């Protein structure tokens, strides 16, 4: 071999490129979206510049690329483009992740999200649209910004869409996007009810009901507000003051106290009285004393009530309709009622006097036949 010529020709190694990108509605295969080469040697790296094209814009795998201006580049790479040639390229178009925003709703104690709650889809290509069907969920029902689990939803094609125009559901995917639902506090109107007490206070402890609690939940009310009139009335608007919602079986943070009204009902009076046996069942107003009046208030009353028996004993006054109450010192009759109270009346035994006369008989005996009562 000595003295001869000995030559080896090293030819360029052909490379096949794989390009991958998210669906964008176009036919381009950009070198900047290079995924891999099939035959780089010795751990070398190369890049791809320029643009090629494919014939189908839709999601697909291994579409043949018309190379166009695609070219190998070694700028910043460890390999040398002189050692390689670009033989062909394939393009993988993968589904485009989209995001969804749902209509803000008031707290409703539900973790269900309906497709009909959809407000907007974002990250769609151009003028393409899709529709959404199905039912899905959020992790909890409480107030806040929630991430929607989209597993129960289905994307549907735009009406009239085909392979060349319009939105195709197969080109998109919900996974990888952001999916948010905002839940706001539900406003509540409280009804407070109490008997007349001579004040303008509306205490939370006198709560009667809320108008819009969800899912059978309960709340209570603390603090107090005020009204403009202390007298019996329905639906007086309350200045809320320190009134505040308190957790019950539900969370107060899921609600807001929007308004309150106060119903002041008549104060129930009690009564008691007594008389000496008089052989009738009348209970005269003059023998009856009223109680449970607001401190500092008095009423006048007149008429006749009825008890169950004329005989001596303790009774309940049964016919209060015969007693009329009227305004008195500081007291307004319309703020009171006798209905519903306790009304007791006692008939006491009547004392009987005895007298009599007889002729002197030298004894101390008083014989009954000589006596009379009066």
Please place each PLM-identified region on the residue numbering.
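Short loop/turn motifs that initiate or flank beta-strands
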Residues: 1-374
């Amino acid at each position: 071999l000595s003295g001869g010529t000995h030559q080896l020709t090293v030819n360029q190694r052909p490379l096949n490129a794989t390009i991958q990108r998210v669906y964008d509605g176009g036919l381009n295969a950009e070198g900047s979206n290079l995924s891999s080469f099939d035959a780089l040697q010795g751990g070398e790296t190369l890049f791809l510049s320029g643009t090629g094209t494919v014939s189908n814009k839709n999601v697909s795998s291994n579409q043949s690329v018309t190379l166009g201006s695609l070219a190998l580049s070694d700028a910043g790479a460890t390999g040398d483009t002189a050692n390689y040639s670009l033989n062909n390229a394939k393009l993988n178009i993968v589904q485009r992740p989209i995001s969804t925003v749902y209509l803000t709703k008031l707290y409703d104690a539900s973790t269900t999200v309906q497709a009909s709650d959809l407000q907007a889809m974002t990250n769609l290509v151009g003028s393409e649209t899709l529709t959404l069907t199905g039912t899905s969920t959020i992790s909890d029902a409480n107030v806040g910004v929630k991430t929607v689990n989209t597993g129960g939803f289905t994307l549907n094609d735009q009406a009239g869409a085909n392979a060349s125009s319009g939105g195709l559901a197969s080109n998109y995917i919900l996974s990888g996007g952001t999916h948010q639902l905002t839940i706001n506090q539900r406003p509540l109107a409280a009804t407070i009810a109490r008997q007349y007490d001579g004040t303008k206070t509306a205490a939370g402890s006198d709560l009667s009901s809320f108008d819009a609690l969800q899912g059978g939940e309960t709340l209570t009310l603390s603090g107090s507000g005020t009204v403009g009139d202390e007298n019996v009335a329905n639906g007086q608007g309350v200045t809320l003051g320190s009134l505040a919602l308190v957790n019950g079986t539900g969370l107060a943070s899921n609600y807001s106290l929007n308004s309150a009204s106060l119903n002041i009902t008549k104060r129930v009076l009690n009564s008691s009285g007594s008389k000496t046996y008089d052989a009738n069942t009348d209970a005269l107003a003059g023998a009856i004393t009223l109680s449970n009046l607001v401190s500092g208030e008095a009423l006048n009353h007149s008429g006749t009530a009825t008890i169950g028996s004329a005989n001596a004993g303790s009774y309940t006054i049964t016919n209060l309709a015969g007693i009329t109450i009227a305004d008195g010192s500081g007291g307004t009759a319309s703020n009171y009622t006798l209905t519903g109270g306790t009304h007791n009346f006692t008939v006491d035994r009547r004392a009987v006097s005895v007298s009599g006369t007889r002729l002197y008989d030298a004894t101390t005996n008083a014989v009954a036949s000589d006596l009379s009562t009066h």
